[in-house]
């Protein structure tokens, strides 16, 4: 394939490992994965945890909500939100090769009335007033091809993210890397959302830590979270009961 990308954007490749297809950005690091025999299934634990916002809304309300992904990856979250949850879904991706790969190799549907993929700089696009207050579930996974640190990771960026959310909206962020960089990222998120709004998971075995931030801090009773988890598991096949056990507020 001949690239027409600017020099700063990495080349996109994929590799197959049995029934699992991986997306790479000019490196060995995996940027996303798909089961070729079950393309809507969420393969990695951290990707599943990016759906933990489901614990904080009534399951019956999910199809009428709006999900947004900053960073397309292998389109796992975008496909799941659109096809499985039946949500209006918007994804913002900088690299046109990633979008082409997702459409060609990772079963991402074409845009339609409920699905829109924008080729844009996420940090700039989310400052557009048309998005403010419209997003119920914001999922942020913005890493460069070396997976060293988030590309956008300052307090102003997280404040812009919060401005996107509906009153009961949530943001989930994938943080990967050293404990020192994780701690800095959490403090920046807390500065934008408030410490009482932060719910961090423990790191997965692969080193990914998902942090959930609520637009408005709440403390749902554990019984309600468990009830919703049962519904999430039976309706959408996600390990939500495990989330309830390991997801704790930063400030009790």
What are these regions (language model features)?
Residues 1-18, 22, 30-37, 45, ...:
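SAM/dcSAM-binding transferase cores
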Residues 5, 17, 23, 38-167, ...:
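The AdoMet/dcAdoMet-binding core of the Class I SAM-like
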